[in-house]
Amino acid sequence: MAVISMKQLLEAGVHFGHQTRRWNPKMAKYIFTERNGIHVIDLQQTVKLADQAYEFVRDAAANDAVILFVGTKKQAAEAVADEATRAGQYFINHRWLGGTLTNWGTIQKRIARLKEIKRMEEEGTFEVLPKKEVALLNKQRARLEKFLGGIEDMPRIPDVMYVVDPHKEQIAVKEAKKLGIPVVAMVDTNADPDDIDVIIPANDDAIRAVKLITAKLADAVIEGRQGEDAEVAFEADTQAESIEEIVEVVEGSNEA
């Protein structure tokens, strides 16, 4: 049984890699072919590796792991926030602040400041302050929420980090590796897979592809926490589409 079917991956465009000139040779084993200057990801491997990622995240969640979802590019920001929240976990979907993990003490101070400003408003302090000071506090709160709102209630440094596009999120990945935090990631054909513990070869530039993979890992968290089966699992015969179908889809898309 697979948690994501070949058909779902195809429909979401997970197979589209980058232009061949932008590839990272270390991703060669995850590439099926090249068509019209674009690398095509081997979705048979993606199906298998997505299963492994699902199991890894599910098992971590079953052991009360704190899981941080990271994706700051515009194609990933919404899905990362929505799915992490749905799973009761944490996220960073705007710029990664250097030291978010390796300088956690300082980050906690900024989070404490965010909570303090919120508390001031709730307790009515804003009502007795000058308007100019309230405006400055609101501006400070908005900035802190933008960068730290998704980890405001994170109790500790995460036990697992899920990343959309480790090529873009290199600083986040390096911080995780320095602290021994395992990294699960959607890895496109332009990325270096060496620092990724659990690789999901996938197009990380398409919103539908990011949503599909991210939602499935959120399902894994929910299943791990609840001890229940996730929404859908696919029998092997639902993946009967051959890998050649991927080539047909790519050629058709490129010719359109």
UniProtKB/Swiss-Prot annotation:
GO terms, biological process: translation
Disulfide bonds: none
Gene Ontology, cellular component aspect: cytosolic small ribosomal subunit
UniProt keyword list: Ribonucleoprotein, Ribosomal protein
Signal peptide, first to last residue: none
Pfam families: Ribosomal_S2
Molecular functions per Gene Ontology: structural constituent of ribosome
Family: Belongs to the universal ribosomal protein uS2 family.
PANTHER family: 30S RIBOSOMAL PROTEIN S2 PROKARYOTIC AND ORGANELLAR, SMALL RIBOSOMAL SUBUNIT PROTEIN US2M
Classification via HAMAP family: Ribosomal_uS2_B (MF_00291_B)
Identification of the protein by name: Small ribosomal subunit protein uS2
Highest classification ranks of the organism: Bacteria, Bacillati, Bacillota, Bacilli, Lactobacillales
